[in-house]
Design a protein with these regions (language model features):
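Hydrophobic alpha-helical signal peptides and transmembrane signal-/tail-anchor segments
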Residues: 9, 22-23, 40-44
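Sequence-pattern detector for short linear motifs
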Residues: 5, 19-22, 33, 203, ...
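Intrinsically disordered, low-complexity regions enriched for glutamine and histidine
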Residues: 7-10, 17-18, 87, 233
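Core catalytic alpha/beta fold that binds nucleotide/phospho-ligands
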Residues: 43-268
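Feature targets compositionally biased, intrinsically disordered low-complexity regions
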Residues: 14-16, 24-26, 40, 112, ...
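Positively charged N-terminal leader segments that act as targeting/secretion signals
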Residues: 1-2, 11-30
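Short, Lys/Arg-enriched N-terminal segments with co-localized hydrophobic residues
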Residues: 31-46
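Ala/Thr-enriched low-complexity intrinsically disordered regions
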Residues: 6-7, 28, 36
Length: 268
């Protein structure tokens, strides 16, 4: 198996409104206060990873997107039962957030109209150095856009809105015994479960591999390492500082992710 994890970004305070995130590297802690440097970083090359999230209950001007950049299945307002409506609205919001991130990154929004699906049904752009990934859970949607100036870009993202589950039983379905033993000792089983689940999902989604391969990803929580045959080497992010649990994989070292949320009128 290939080692893909060189570092992890962790936040595990229960205070959901906190913005600073902590980067856990090998042997040292480094702190990045994103809001303080966001404007400056827009003008330097290392600003390559953009993450935006929003809730479908908040209004967003989907009609401002040029019609030619919208796939046919998103042109009409979602209708049907509540679950179908929720899912379609999440897709519209994801498309809108990706449009916003392309503009924020100074990248051509024409890419939005060129999205195609791979053989594994993963949506992506027709250019190798720019990749994106989308996840939604409940009414929440998150989008990651990554631009790599020197090589092929590969990213994956997973969000999970907290809900009551039999975490131990679920762990037994995909985690080896050693990881289950570690999980049983954690004081916050919910946070520990979503860490194990979301990190795996993010890795697999970067290559369009489904959760059927979840158990093939090896997670060593004490060593902060993940091994997988389905992903290139890179770094992972995990946090519970947002309104949901969040994990992302980026095939780049020393990543500098910048988070935005939609506040009804603009990304903040």
């Amino acid at each position: 198996m290939r080692l893909i994890l060189t570092a992890l970004l962790f936040c595990h305070s229960k205070g959901r409104d906190k913005r600073p995130l902590f980067f856990w590297g090998i042997g040292a802690w480094r702190i990045s206060f994103y809001n303080a440097i966001k404007v400056i970083c827009l003008f330097i090359i290392c600003m390559t990873t953009f993450i935006a999230y929003a809730n479908i209950q908040q209004p967003f001007p989907f009609d401002e997107i040029p019609r030619e950049l919208i796939p046919e299945n998103l042109h009409t307002e979602p209708q049907g039962n509540s679950r179908i409506t929720q899912r379609r609205q999440c897709r519209r919001l994801a498309h809108f957030l990706l449009w916003q991130l392309l503009k924020t990154a100074g990248t051509s929004t024409a890419l939005l109209g060129q999205i195609y699906r791979t053989q594994s049904d993963r949506p992506q752009f027709p250019v190798e150095n720019i990749d994106f990934n989308i996840s939604h859970s409940g009414d929440w949607v998150a989008v990651l856009l990554h631009i790599n100036e020197s090589e092929k870009s590969a990213v994956g993202i997973d969000i999970e809105f907290s809900k009551k589950r039999n975490f131990s039983a679920l762990m037994a379905h995909f985690a080896p015994q050693a990881e289950q033993d570690w999980f049983a000792k954690q004081p916050d089983e919910e946070q520990a479960f979503y860490r194990c689940w979301c990190l795996r999902e993010a890795v697999l989604k970067s290559q369009g591999v489904g959760i059927v391969k979840l158990s093939s990803v090896m997670h060593l929580p004490k060593q902060l390492q993940i091994f997988s045959d389905y992903c290139p080497k890179g770094e992972l992010i995990f946090t519970d500082e947002l309104p949901f649990y969040f994990a992302a994989f980026i095939n780049q070292s020393k990543i500098q992710p910048h988070f935005y949320h939609w506040d009804r009128k603009k990304l903040l």
